[in-house]
Amino acid sequence: MSTDLKQVNKSKKALQRNDNLSESKFVERLIKISRVSKVTKGGKKLSFRAIVVVGNENGQVGVGVGKADDVVNAFKKAKADGRKNLIKIPITKSLSIPHNVIGIFGACKIIMRPSIEGSGVIAGGSVRTVLEVAGIKNVIAKQLGSNNVLNNARAAVSGLNNLTTKSQVLKKRDLHSNSSEKINS
């Protein structure tokens, strides 16, 4: 009986190790930590808000927000939220995006264009962090509108979510890539 229990515990530990290994593939980058307060009749209650970008540098990225009484717990909550909001994006062979795309969230507008190999990530602030964590190495991005860090990160994710590959477009239009028909615009 006790040997069976030991084997079960060993297998649970092995599963936990495998989970930890799969979690280690993800990169977490902190964008911002803010001290926020809630005013109650007893006074001001201070807490912390963390904004984190989570990704595997291979086409998956998500933005998470967490609030807690201390910085460590806020960061943990933001990481968990980022993992819940992961999206998969297509990346070209030159580690760029397949086509121009615009991402909008609130008053933020992000314009992203593919760039030649070796040009690097030309973007600022939280958009740069989102693109790097997603695994995009060659892209040009411009922020328009609001300078809000969280909304800019979410606008970048929204734009990346709108990316499509050639095969997806052909499938949507009921065409085949090796068809001899001309596509009229």
UniProtKB/Swiss-Prot annotation:
With S4 and S12 plays an important role in translational accuracy. One of its GO terms (molecular function) is rRNA binding. Pfam families: Ribosomal_S5, Ribosomal_S5_C. Part of the 30S ribosomal subunit. Contacts protein S4. GO terms for biological process: translation. Disulfide bonds: none annotated. HAMAP family: Ribosomal_uS5_B (MF_01307_B). It comes from the Eukaryota. This is Small ribosomal subunit protein uS5c. It comes from Trieres chinensis (Marine centric diatom). The N-terminal domain interacts with the head of the 30S subunit; the C-terminal domain interacts with the body and contacts protein S4. The interaction surface between S4 and S5 is involved in control of translational fidelity.
